[in-house]
Amino acid sequence: TKVMTLLVAAEKLNNESLGQKIEISIEATDYSFKNDCSAAGFLVGEQVTVEDLLNGIILPSGAEAAYQAAIMTSGTLEQFVDDMNKKVQELGISQTTHFSNPVGIFDENNYSTACDMAVILHAAMENEICKKVLSARNYTTSCTQQHPQGITFSSKFLNRIDRKFGKGKVVGAKTGYVN
């Protein structure tokens, strides 16, 4: 789900917008907390860059980052989910994939297949912004008042693959599961 969230958000952005500051809302952190989701660690009121937000969606699988990116690019969660499902149709996978939220929270109306996830990942890797995020081994956010040293995110999966098989064998990835 979060790869599609990244893709839909990134398609509404450009490289110049990556440095733009976004304030983390209480709604974003509450959504993450109430749904017992993984979080990037952004705090209410924290001013982060769009690039920080996008990396926060993927590397630590941050629900608050996904929520905030959805609101930032589409205005409401409902509109963002509509945008996600329009992208599903564009990719030709609407028979077996449908999204009901930008985070991947379990819902019978939020479903996909492994094959469709590969289609989504392929589309994301064709987007320059997405490719940069999905292929990052490590990323440190910009310094903020709440995190003076920034927050360092690491792709445990890509780093493990690099250690075992050598760098460059896998160029982009996102792990995830639903209980």
Question: Residues of each region from the PLM?
Answer:
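Active-site-adjacent loops and short helices of periplasmic peptidoglycan-processing enzymes
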Residues: 1-115, 124-128
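Domain-terminus/edge residues, biased toward the C-terminal soluble/receptor-binding domains
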Residues: 94-95, 106-179
